[in-house]
Amino acid sequence: MSIQTDDFSEQRIIAATPASANEEAIERALRPKQLDEYVGQEKIRGQLEIFITAARQRHEALDHTLLFGPPGLGKTTLAHIIAREMGVNLRQTSGPVLERAGDLAALLTNLEANDVLFIDEIHRLSPVVEEILYPALEDYQIDIMIGEGPAARSVRLDLQPFTLVGATTRAGMLTNPLRDRFGIVARLEFYTPLELTKIVTRSSALLNAPIDEDGAFEIAKRSRGTPRIANRLLRRVRDYAEVKGNGKITKAMADAALVMLDVDPVGFDLMDRKLLEAVLFKFNGGPVGLDNLAAAIGEERDTIEDVLEPYLIQQGFLQRTPRGRIATPVAYAHFGVTAPQTGPNGDLWAGQ
């Protein structure tokens, strides 16, 4: 089952990126508005509650905050919650949009005291824009050039105190000077099935879709630890329940809908299984080089590296080695195949 777009990563129903502008609008309606409504990320939530309360009591801007982690885990949601809990406005933009220094200057000069500026994909800021940002973060001042040629001169503008909330899926791509200017740094982790069950239950109530606990858990455990995927699957299961049943989402109804969508009990879709089956059955468990694997399943090597592999490796189904990709005993068990006692790399699995 796929959502038809031009980008492979967005076609998959279990993709962690938004599939369309319409989906983003639905996501906004389902987002929690306050910290006490936010499910999961207990450590981060507890820290933010303290930092926000302290900043409010001192009537100061919250320290600049960096949120990083895989897509779909709630970085944008947390940025909106921070602004709402602080009782200030939120201005939202993204790194690729800020092409010129003037673009950033226009945003910064329009901020009111203690406002939140949220920059998504902050790792994609251009060096020119990033240089303008440094004095703004440290001293609440920016230097802009007025005029051209010999008549050009630098003017320093004072800014209102503000909070920058940066979000990125690739914290390693941030420059050290930018990373060092964040007082609060938080990594968002994947959610547990129980946390996702709570999210699915809450979202179903907002969507007026009756669901029982087993039905919510069935959706949650196939959502790859990601709320965005859980909410997307919930909407598709709701459609199925309304057409094929009485509208209530039960475990059996959720299972039938997800089977129809080609999402298996661990959250794999057709492409995940195709890749693993190629390693297991076409290359005897590996090792297999990336180019050979790409040719075997008819996908680009970049798609395999950036879209398909990360979740399989993270869940322990696939391993990267210097000689190529190999299937793990977990992958063999998932497909009901006996794993060799001695793997492709000698005694890797001996005794397991």
From Swiss-Prot:
ATP binds at residues 30-31, 72, 75-77, 138-140, 181, 191, 228. Residues 192-262 are annotated as: Small ATPAse domain (RuvB-S). GO terms for molecular function: ATP binding; ATP hydrolysis activity; four-way junction DNA binding; four-way junction helicase activity. It is found in: Cytoplasm. Its main location: cytoplasm. DNA binds at residues 301, 320, 325. One of its GO terms (cellular component) is Holliday junction resolvase complex. Belongs to the RuvB family. It comes from the Bacteria. InterPro entries: AAA+_ATPase, AAA_lid_4, DNA_helicase_Holl-junc_RuvB, P-loop_NTPase, RuvB-like_N, RuvB_C, WH-like_DNA-bd_sf, WH_DNA-bd_sf. Residues 265-352 are annotated as: Head domain (RuvB-H). Has 3 domains, the large (RuvB-L) and small ATPase (RuvB-S) domains and the C-terminal head (RuvB-H) domain. The head domain binds DNA, while the ATPase domains jointly bind ATP, ADP or are empty depending on the state of the subunit in the translocation cycle. During a single DNA translocation step the structure of each domain remains the same, but their relative positions change. Gene3D superfamilies: 1.10.8.60, P-loop containing nucleotide triphosphate hydrolases, Winged helix-like DNA-binding domain superfamily/Winged helix DNA-binding domain. It catalyses: ATP + H2O = ADP + phosphate + H(+). It is an enzyme of class 3 (hydrolase). Residues 5-191 are annotated as: Large ATPase domain (RuvB-L). Mg(2+) binds at residue 76. This is Holliday junction branch migration complex subunit RuvB.
